[in-house]
Protein backbone atom coordinates (compact mmCIF):
# COMPACT_ATOMS: atom_id res chain seq x y z
CA UNK A 1 0.00 0.00 0.00
CA UNK A 2 1.39 3.39 -0.96
CA UNK A 3 1.59 6.39 1.33
CA UNK A 4 -0.99 8.06 -0.90
CA UNK A 5 -3.45 5.22 -0.27
CA UNK A 6 -2.76 5.31 3.49
CA UNK A 7 -3.40 9.06 3.58
CA UNK A 8 -6.63 8.72 1.60
CA UNK A 9 -7.80 6.00 3.99
CA UNK A 10 -6.83 8.16 6.99
CA UNK A 11 -9.04 10.96 5.66
CA UNK A 12 -11.84 8.49 4.93
CA UNK A 13 -11.63 7.22 8.52
CA UNK A 14 -12.50 10.76 9.67
CA UNK A 15 -15.55 10.98 7.38
CA UNK A 16 -18.97 11.00 8.98
CA UNK A 17 -21.63 8.58 7.75
CA UNK A 18 -23.36 11.51 6.08
CA UNK A 19 -20.16 12.39 4.20
CA UNK A 20 -19.71 8.78 3.12
CA UNK A 21 -23.32 8.65 1.95
CA UNK A 22 -22.76 11.90 0.05
CA UNK A 23 -19.69 10.41 -1.62
CA UNK A 24 -21.62 7.31 -2.62
CA UNK A 25 -24.39 9.29 -4.30
CA UNK A 26 -22.78 12.51 -5.58
CA UNK A 27 -21.97 11.36 -9.11
CA UNK A 28 -25.19 9.35 -9.43
CA UNK A 29 -27.10 12.48 -8.42
CA UNK A 30 -25.09 14.51 -10.95
CA UNK A 31 -25.94 11.98 -13.66
CA UNK A 32 -29.61 12.19 -12.68
CA UNK A 33 -29.48 16.00 -12.95
CA UNK A 34 -27.90 15.65 -16.39
CA UNK A 35 -30.50 13.08 -17.46
CA UNK A 36 -33.29 15.50 -16.47
CA UNK A 37 -31.74 18.14 -18.74
CA UNK A 38 -31.24 15.58 -21.52
CA UNK A 39 -34.93 14.68 -21.30
CA UNK A 40 -36.00 18.33 -21.13
CA UNK A 41 -34.05 19.29 -24.26
CA UNK A 42 -34.28 15.91 -26.03
CA UNK A 43 -30.50 15.55 -26.25
CA UNK A 44 -28.29 12.50 -25.65
CA UNK A 45 -27.01 12.16 -22.09
CA UNK A 46 -23.33 12.09 -23.11
CA UNK A 47 -23.69 15.47 -24.83
CA UNK A 48 -25.37 17.08 -21.81
CA UNK A 49 -22.74 15.65 -19.44
CA UNK A 50 -20.05 16.97 -21.80
CA UNK A 51 -21.54 20.46 -21.62
CA UNK A 52 -21.68 20.27 -17.82
CA UNK A 53 -18.05 19.11 -17.66
CA UNK A 54 -16.88 21.80 -20.08
CA UNK A 55 -18.56 24.53 -18.01
CA UNK A 56 -17.21 23.22 -14.69
CA UNK A 57 -13.80 24.95 -14.32
CA UNK A 58 -13.95 27.67 -11.63
CA UNK A 59 -17.72 27.15 -11.40
CA UNK A 60 -19.64 26.13 -8.27
CA UNK A 61 -21.73 23.02 -8.86
CA UNK A 62 -25.13 24.68 -8.42
CA UNK A 63 -24.13 27.44 -10.85
CA UNK A 64 -22.63 24.88 -13.24
CA UNK A 65 -26.04 23.22 -13.57
CA UNK A 66 -27.76 26.58 -14.14
CA UNK A 67 -25.19 27.54 -16.78
CA UNK A 68 -25.55 24.18 -18.54
CA UNK A 69 -29.34 24.44 -18.53
CA UNK A 70 -29.17 27.98 -19.92
CA UNK A 71 -26.77 26.95 -22.70
CA UNK A 72 -28.87 23.93 -23.64
CA UNK A 73 -31.93 26.18 -23.83
CA UNK A 74 -30.16 28.72 -26.03
CA UNK A 75 -28.80 26.00 -28.31
CA UNK A 76 -32.05 24.09 -28.75
CA UNK A 77 -33.97 27.30 -29.46
CA UNK A 78 -31.56 28.23 -32.26
CA UNK A 79 -29.66 30.89 -30.34
CA UNK A 80 -26.01 31.86 -30.47
CA UNK A 81 -23.09 31.06 -28.20
CA UNK A 82 -22.57 34.78 -27.52
CA UNK A 83 -25.91 34.77 -25.67
CA UNK A 84 -24.42 32.40 -23.08
CA UNK A 85 -22.55 33.89 -20.13
CA UNK A 86 -21.50 30.98 -17.90
CA UNK A 87 -19.36 31.50 -14.81
CA UNK A 88 -16.28 29.98 -16.42
CA UNK A 89 -13.70 30.85 -19.03
CA UNK A 90 -14.78 31.88 -22.53
CA UNK A 91 -12.73 29.01 -23.98
CA UNK A 92 -14.73 26.56 -21.86
CA UNK A 93 -17.99 28.16 -22.96
CA UNK A 94 -16.88 27.70 -26.56
CA UNK A 95 -15.85 24.10 -25.88
CA UNK A 96 -19.30 23.34 -24.44
CA UNK A 97 -20.92 24.91 -27.49
CA UNK A 98 -18.65 22.86 -29.75
CA UNK A 99 -19.92 19.69 -28.08
CA UNK A 100 -23.49 20.76 -28.79
CA UNK A 101 -22.91 21.86 -32.36
CA UNK A 102 -20.82 18.86 -33.43
CA UNK A 103 -23.19 16.29 -31.83
CA UNK A 104 -20.50 13.69 -31.00
CA UNK A 105 -21.83 10.16 -31.42
CA UNK A 106 -20.50 8.69 -28.16
CA UNK A 107 -18.78 9.45 -24.84
CA UNK A 108 -15.27 9.02 -26.22
CA UNK A 109 -15.97 11.59 -28.94
CA UNK A 110 -17.10 14.05 -26.24
CA UNK A 111 -13.94 13.30 -24.23
CA UNK A 112 -11.85 14.05 -27.33
CA UNK A 113 -13.41 17.53 -27.50
CA UNK A 114 -12.97 18.11 -23.75
CA UNK A 115 -9.24 17.18 -23.93
CA UNK A 116 -8.16 18.34 -20.45
CA UNK A 117 -7.56 15.45 -18.03
CA UNK A 118 -9.48 16.96 -15.11
CA UNK A 119 -12.64 17.80 -17.04
CA UNK A 120 -12.42 14.57 -19.04
CA UNK A 121 -12.24 12.56 -15.81
CA UNK A 122 -15.12 14.62 -14.38
CA UNK A 123 -17.14 13.80 -17.51
CA UNK A 124 -16.41 10.08 -17.20
CA UNK A 125 -17.23 10.08 -13.46
CA UNK A 126 -20.67 11.57 -14.12
CA UNK A 127 -21.16 9.01 -16.90
CA UNK A 128 -20.46 6.30 -14.28
CA UNK A 129 -16.95 5.20 -15.25
CA UNK A 130 -14.68 4.07 -12.39
CA UNK A 131 -12.11 6.86 -12.57
CA UNK A 132 -11.72 9.85 -10.30
CA UNK A 133 -10.98 13.52 -10.64
CA UNK A 134 -7.52 14.46 -9.47
CA UNK A 135 -7.61 18.12 -8.58
CA UNK A 136 -5.81 20.14 -5.94
CA UNK A 137 -8.07 18.84 -3.18
CA UNK A 138 -7.48 15.21 -4.20
CA UNK A 139 -3.73 15.92 -4.20
CA UNK A 140 -3.92 17.45 -0.69
CA UNK A 141 -5.85 14.46 0.66
CA UNK A 142 -3.43 11.94 -0.86
CA UNK A 143 -0.46 13.89 0.49
CA UNK A 144 -2.10 14.71 3.85
CA UNK A 145 -1.02 18.28 3.20
CA UNK A 146 -3.45 21.21 3.42
CA UNK A 147 -2.51 23.86 0.87
CA UNK A 148 -4.30 26.52 -1.08
CA UNK A 149 -5.03 25.49 -4.65
CA UNK A 150 -2.40 27.97 -5.85
CA UNK A 151 0.22 26.16 -3.75
CA UNK A 152 -0.53 22.68 -5.10
CA UNK A 153 2.16 21.61 -7.55
CA UNK A 154 1.36 20.81 -11.16
CA UNK A 155 -0.12 17.34 -11.49
CA UNK A 156 1.42 15.59 -14.48
CA UNK A 157 0.24 12.44 -16.21
CA UNK A 158 2.33 10.01 -14.12
CA UNK A 159 1.31 11.55 -10.79
CA UNK A 160 -2.34 11.71 -11.90
CA UNK A 161 -2.26 7.97 -12.66
CA UNK A 162 -0.56 7.18 -9.33
CA UNK A 163 -3.17 9.17 -7.43
CA UNK A 164 -6.05 7.61 -9.37
CA UNK A 165 -4.66 4.16 -8.59
CA UNK A 166 -4.40 5.11 -4.92
CA UNK A 167 -8.02 6.31 -4.80
CA UNK A 168 -9.08 3.13 -6.59
CA UNK A 169 -7.23 0.93 -4.07
CA UNK A 170 -8.64 2.90 -1.14
CA UNK A 171 -12.12 2.59 -2.62
CA UNK A 172 -11.82 -1.16 -3.09
CA UNK A 173 -10.97 -1.56 0.61
CA UNK A 174 -14.45 -0.20 1.37
CA UNK A 175 -16.40 -1.60 -1.60
CA UNK A 176 -16.45 1.78 -3.33
CA UNK A 177 -15.40 3.08 -6.73
CA UNK A 178 -12.48 5.47 -7.05
CA UNK A 179 -14.86 8.38 -7.64
CA UNK A 180 -16.99 7.50 -4.61
CA UNK A 181 -13.88 7.44 -2.41
CA UNK A 182 -12.68 10.73 -3.88
CA UNK A 183 -16.08 12.36 -3.35
CA UNK A 184 -16.42 11.12 0.25
CA UNK A 185 -12.92 12.20 1.24
CA UNK A 186 -13.36 15.57 -0.49
CA UNK A 187 -16.46 16.32 1.59
CA UNK A 188 -14.70 15.20 4.79
CA UNK A 189 -11.57 17.23 3.90
CA UNK A 190 -13.70 20.34 3.35
CA UNK A 191 -15.22 19.96 6.82
CA UNK A 192 -11.95 19.10 8.57
CA UNK A 193 -10.07 22.03 7.03
CA UNK A 194 -12.99 24.45 6.68
CA UNK A 195 -12.36 24.82 2.95
Predicted regions and their residues:
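HhH-family (HhH-GPD) DNA N-glycosylase catalytic core used in base-excision repair
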Residues: 1-195
Amino acid sequence: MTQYTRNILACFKQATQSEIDHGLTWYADAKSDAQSMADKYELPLHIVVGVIAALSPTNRWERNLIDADNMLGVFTSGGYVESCTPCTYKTMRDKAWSILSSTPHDADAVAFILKGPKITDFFYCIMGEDVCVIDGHAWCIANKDRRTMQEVPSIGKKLRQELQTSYSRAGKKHGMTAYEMQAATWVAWKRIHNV
